[in-house]
Regions:
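Glycine-rich, acidic/polar active-site loops that bind/position phosphate-bearing ligands
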Residues: 144-329, 338-341, 348-591
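Short, intrinsically disordered, low-complexity segments enriched in Ser/Thr and Pro
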Residues: 108-142, 252, 375-377, 502-511, ...
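N-terminal hydrophobic targeting/anchoring segments and the immediately downstream early-domain regions
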Residues: 2-25, 142-158, 163
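Hydrophobic/aromatic-rich, well-ordered segments within soluble, folded domains that form packed cores
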Residues: 85, 89-91, 308-322, 348, ...
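Histidine/acidic residue-rich metal-binding segments in metalloenzymes
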Residues: 16-20, 24-120, 126-141
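Short linear, low-complexity motifs centered on an aromatic residue
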Residues: 97-114, 132, 230, 237-239, ...
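Short, ordered loop/turn segments at secondary-structure junctions
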Residues: 69, 93-94, 121, 224, ...
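C-terminal amphipathic alpha-helical interaction region
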Residues: 525-730
């Protein structure tokens, strides 16, 4: 056989050194947002009256007046050209889970045979991409392709290389959202209105409530050479075969361990570029699995945080290649070790500085705290199936439910103290005051260690939606997902719950009941109603699946079936009542989700079939031929009895290889047949279910046979980099 690519790339990987990264001379605080059109730059480059009106649009949601657009565009162009920019693009988030952009140059004919740089308000505010070329669920056909991208002033413009990037929404000519940003902005507006209304029961001066989001991005890094020798990684983002390494994460020595030099250089480079783009990176560390890492920023306003996460994922891929790596954002790139998630820390902040999910110092403040906790639980309880659908994907399904990630059942962990408080409110006399214990100190009896302040909420890593002191942590979101999907459903559901709460309180007050008494009455009803969503136990246990089913929670795990929750009557009613999405938009999104699911599984099945027939079987039969020659040589040299004894092991291996390759060939034929049958199903929903039920199980069977062969075939013949090489060469 020709030279084994695997050994060549392994040898090259060992020779690679950390790329030197020159840090800027300025402090991070000085180069932060260097390539962002910040308020300070707006103030410098815009006329005073235009600046004031634009800030009003950003801060108070007033409608953008087209009359100021030209002045804003001119100021942006002037700043951008001083930064060496030559092009601009509307940067948006179609339903592909990535970002999209088309670059146009500033230059135009000047009418005198030359060129001049121009950028008008019209070009800033609106463009017309071809909507039929993006996933749209049938909303746009090729013969009616017009769509609009429209500037989102609340997310600042930024520069990548020589291009001015303008964050935009993307909608159809008929007005339906074809992206993630448009419904996210609607959901944030809905939760702002609803939370402000409820807030005013406690703080009449509150005029606005902001949703904040802090995400934690997990990822794997793999040497680029090793990656290029694994067609499955290149084409699907995960390994479709590969026996577990003898050592993986069982020693618990990678989590928070020393960061390898090459990885440290990558992280440093990434953070510098991220900070220059205004992404406030805060934390970096090794994660649990080998070659798995995490990056987390300081929390930001939700819409901006989502934009920054999408920008960061794109930046990670670019910087990784510079350092000889490929970044893997797939939720489960390797079997047998932890996958990657993206925890979303979600909170609400009133404009008077009050964190609405944080305990207060007075009974009234604690009543506000309990109100927002309970109504968030009501939202999660009513729409637990929808929230699961919002985080489900063909890729994340491989991670959820394993003993490494939250289960595919949405529940909420509150901690002992808060659970006891809600039980107390439910049963006690409502005239009793709400007194939460403050943070308590913990003496460790070690002189050199200061007293620790212990939070009065514990941690439950198995909970998908956990309260962590002043916010909720939504842990089920996948590492490569657009967080907007989960944030749209969560914020819309919370808005509905808060609206419902305020309406019931108002009705009681209209009947003459005291306001605080009315609040407590409604809360007590809701505490009873949403009790099934509260679970502080082990989410990994089989008992919990049975218990969750008894509680009426959604225990479905089939990805295509879970997507149906978007079209449940209560989901449609919730989205329409909050004006986040209408039925047509929801139906279109589900079409896209089912189609994306089918395509991802289809690609994996094709790649697995190709590798099985063109890599695994030839390599295995080549080794089998060597064994056959060895047996024949034994029989030529030794007397029959001795030859039989000495060649018995090889004969067994020859037989096992023959049987396993025969099974692989038959399974690949079955896999191809299952795909063909599924592909003939016209209804995309039914086709997705067919892929889940008939195609995916056959892929698992093929993998089992291949992984067994990997442990038999001579290492020198195996052409695909093994797990030990992918995970431990850094």
């Amino acid at each position: 056989m020709s030279e084994n690519l695997r050994f060549r790339v392994v040898e090259e990987a060992f020779k690679k050194k950390a790329v030197e990264v020159a840090a800027p001379k300025e402090r991070p605080s000085e180069y932060f947002a260097k390539y962002v059109f910040t308020r300070q730059k707006m103030y410098k480059y815009l006329p005073a009256d235009v600046y004031e009106r634009l800030i009003d649009v950003i801060d108070h949601g007033t409608r953008l007046d087209r009359s100021i657009a030209d002045a804003v565009a001119e100021g942006m162009k002037q700043w951008a050209m001083e930064m060496g920019v030559t092009h601009y693009t509307h940067w948006f988030q179609p339903l592909t889970e990535g970002t999209a952009e088309k670059h146009d140059a500033f230059v135009e004919h000047d009418g005198k045979g030359g060129m001049v740089e121009k950028f008008s308000g019209k070009l800033l505010v609106q463009q017309e991409p071809d909507a039929s070329s993006f996933p749209n669920g049938g909303i746009r056909n090729t013969f009616e392709a017009r769509g609009y991208s429209a500037w989102d002033p609340t997310s600042p413009v930024f520069i990548i290389d020589d291009t001015l990037c303008i964050p935009t929404i993307f909608i159809a000519y008929t007005g339906e959202a074809l992206d993630y940003k448009a419904p996210l902005l609607r959901a944030l507006h809905a939760v702002d209105k609803a939370a402000t209304s409820v807030c005013q029961l406690f703080y009449p001066e509150v005029k606005k409530v902001t949703c904040n989001l802090g995400w934690e991005q997990e990822y794997f890094l793999v040497d680029e050479g090793l990656y290029s020798a694994r067609p499955d990684l290149m084409l699907t983002g995960r390994t479709l075969m590969g026996h577990e390494s003898a050592k993986n994460q069982q020693m618990d020595d990678h989590y928070f361990g020393t960061i390898p030099d090459r990885v440290q250089a990558f992280m440093k480079d990434l953070e510098i570029q991220a900070l220059e783009l205004g992404i406030p990176c805060k934390t970096r560390h090794n994660e649990v699995a080998p070659n798995q890492f995490e990056l987390a920023p300081i929390y930001e306003e939700c819409n901006l945080a989502v934009d920054h996460n999408m920008l960061l994922m794109s930046l990670m891929k670019k910087v990784a290649r510079k350092h000889g790596f490929r970044v893997l954002l797939h939720e489960k790139p390797f079997d047998g070790i932890n996958g990657s998630g993206k925890h979303n820390n979600w909170s609400l902040l009133a404009d008077n500085g009050t964190l609405l999910h944080a305990p207060g110092k007075t009974p009234e403040e604690n009543l506000r705290f309990v109100t927002f906790i309970v109504e968030t639980l009501m939202a999660v309880y009513r729409h637990n199936g929808l929230l699961k659908a919002s985080i489900m994907s063909a890729t994340n399904a491989h991670r959820l439910g394993g003993n490494e990630a939250p289960p595919a059942i949405i529940s909420s962990f509150l901690g002992k103290q808060l659970s006891e408080l809600l039980d107390h409110i439910e049963k006690a006399d409502k005239d009793e005051l709400f007194n939460l214990k403050g943070k308590q100190g913990m003496e460790l009896d070690i002189p050199q260690i200061p007293e620790l302040i212990i939070d009065n909420t514990d941690r439950n890593r198995t909970s998908p939606f956990a309260f962590t002191g002043n916010r909720f942590e939504f842990r089920a979101i996948g590492s490569e997902a657009n967080s907007a999907s989960a944030m749209i459903s969560l914020n819309a559901a919370v808005a509905e719950a808060l609206n419902n709460f305020r309406q019931r309180v108002d009705r009681l007050c209209e009947k003459g009941e005291d306001k605080m008494s009315a609040i407590i009455d409604v809360l007590r009803d809701d505490i009873k109603t949403c009790k099934p969503i509260r679970f502080d136990g082990n989410g990994y246990s089989e008992e919990w699946v049975e218990e969750a089913s008894r509680r009426g929670l959604d225990t479905e795990s089939s990805c295509p079936v879970v997507f149906e929750r978007y079209l449940d009557s209560q989901s449609i009613a919730m989205f329409e009542s909050t004006k986040v999405m209408n039925r047509k938009e929801l139906e279109a999104r589900n079409e896209v989700k089912w189609e994306t699911y089918v395509k991802k599984v289809q690609i994996e099945a094709r790649v697995l079939g190709d590798l099985s027939m063109n890599h695994i079987i030839p390599v295995s039969t080549h080794y089998q031929s060597q064994l056959i020659r060895n047996v024949q040589s034994m029989k030529a040299i030794f007397e029959p009895v001795k030859a039989d004894r000495l060649s018995a092991r090889n004969l067994k291996l020859i037989e096992e290889i023959a049987e396993r390759t025969e099974r692989i060939e038959a399974l690949v034929e079955d896999l191809t047949s299952a795909r063909r049958i599924a592909n003939r199903i016209d209804d995309i929903h039914s086709r997705a279910i067919s892929y889940h039920d008939t195609v995916e199980p056959k892929m698992e069977s093929i993998r089992h046979e291949i992984d067994s062969l990997e442990m038999i075939v001579e290492d020198g013949l195996w052409t695909l980099p093994k797990y030990r090489e992918l995970l431990f060469i850094r």
